[in-house]
Regions:
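Domain-terminus/edge residues, biased toward the C-terminal soluble/receptor-binding domains
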Residues: 192, 203-213, 218-415
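Active-site-adjacent loops and short helices of periplasmic peptidoglycan-processing enzymes
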Residues: 2-23, 27-212, 216-221, 225
Length: 415
């Protein structure tokens, strides 16, 4: 992957939070949830809009809008436009639940920019791995072996390796320092449902997040070129044991995000570009994904579906993405994904430079799609070419009609 001439942070945001008090929530009759499903027992946050703090399904269908998918069993879910920030529909969006490894999105968004360059190496010590929880998902890091930062991030995103998380945390300054930085960053993103106890999402008492917060983490992380690359990579080679006098071995690792790699009973999702899945005993299955179709980019998060169907979290996420692409422009948003606290709302419309950059992005994305672009047969989020988007000084968020997420390479359809 060519080195970027300049790290570009996209800083154009969604519309301002709605301050209007809306009418009662509309749960589509064809999308009723099981009455026996667990429900939030207390009040929920209203960050992003009052309706997002209401219990149950929130959706307001307009003329021609499709009904929500049937048999959605997630305790909490949300589907939103990644660019405008509009929440198209949600269900218990601010319910504070165990996040499992989807919390690694916050870890990466916090730590990744600080551990540069990614060619930097680290010799793993026993102390680096001492805090890895029993039964953790692992990529296979060995003590007294050397790894690059790039290797470690592949281990985090593809194999959800808690061992890789702990080594990176050690490089960052230690687990307590990392946890404190993650909590601070969550608050900066206005992800106020989140309480961080461990950097890897391992089950700990009081470690919680929400579908809304996880979506904020994904949206923020996707502004970083390395984050986009790692979260969308399907397979990679990971360093193995270094034997004296021999070339170091490697082994292949595969992304556990089944909407990228597919599996029995679940196909790769057309247009998928990440982000992260997770599972623990207390969290159940959790998933946040981003996908593009016909120039529109959607984010979806599903937490702890009760369905016993294999890969239910992916199937429900895919059905919500399908619905979102069909419903876009035909529903009244029920809330917004908020900008970071440090962002200063700007005024007016997009600058000429920003508009020109957007057109260039769209043209390039169209060329990639037409050519069936891929990287080792997988879909991968593109780097921003230096100067393609305008870097706005001072962290200014422009309140515009669009929030230009960098273009995403479309998956080449599998035969």
């Amino acid at each position: 992957m060519p080195a970027l001439k300049k790290t570009v942070l996209t800083v154009i945001s969604a519309a301002l939070l709605s301050s209007l008090v809306v009418g009662p929530a509309f749960a589509d009759d064809k999308a009723k949830t099981d009455d026996n499903q667990p429900r939030p027992t207390g009040p929920m946050s209203t960050v992003g809009g009052k309706r997002l703090g209401l219990i149950g399904t929130q959706v307001e269908l307009g003329p021609g809008a499709p009904a929500l998918p049937k048999h959605l069993t997630g305790r909490s879910w949300i589907v939103a436009d990644a660019e405008s920030g509009q929440v198209l529909a949600s269900h218990n969006a601010h319910w504070r639940l165990p996040p499992a490894s989807t919390l690694k999105m916050l870890f990466a968004d916090t730590v990744l920019p600080k551990l540069q360059p990614r060619t930097m190496t680290h010799l793993v010590t026993p102390e680096d791995l001492a805090g890895v929880g029993e039964g953790s998902s692992l990529v296979g890091i060995k003590e007294n072996e050397t790894y690059t930062v790039h290797d470690l991030w592949l281990g985090v995103f593809l194999r959800s390796g808690n061992d890789a998380v702990h080594v990176l945390s050690s490089m960052y300054g230690g687990v307590p320092t990392t946890v404190a930085a993650m909590q601070k960053h969550a608050e900066e993103l206005q992800a106020l449902d989140t309480h961080v106890v461990s950097p890897d999402g391992y089950d700990f008492p009081k470690q919680v997040s929400s579908a809304y917060d996880l979506t904020l983490f994904a949206r923020s992380g996707l502004q970083k070129a390395d984050f986009r690359e790692y979260c969308s990579t399907a397979t990679a080679e990971f360093p193995g044991e270094q034997k004296k006098g021999k070339k170091r071995e490697s082994f292949q690792i595969q992304n556990t995000n089944r909407l990228i790699t597919g599996d029995i009973g679940v196909d790769p999702y057309k247009g998928i570009a990440g982000v992260k899945n997770g599972y623990t005993t207390h969290a159940g299955n959790t998933f946040t994904g981003v996908a593009e179709r016909n120039g529109r980019v959607l984010l979806v998060t599903v937490m702890n579906p009760s369905s016993e169907e294999s890969h239910a979290v992916y199937k429900e996420a895919a059905s919500l993405l399908d619905w979102g692409f069909s419903a876009s422009g035909k529903v009244t948003p029920v809330g917004d994904l908020v900008p970071p606290l440090s962002a200063t709302p700007g005024k007016g419309s997009e600058s000429a430079d920003a508009e020109a950059a957007r057109k260039k992005v769209a043209a390039k994305a169209g060329t990639v799609a037409a050519n069936g672009g891929s990287h080792a047969g997988i879909g991968i989020a593109l780097s921003i070419v230096g100067g393609l988007l305008v870097l706005l000084a001072g962290g200014v968020f422009l309140i515009n009609r669009r929030w230009p997420l960098p273009d995403l390479v479309r998956r080449r359809p599998r035969a």
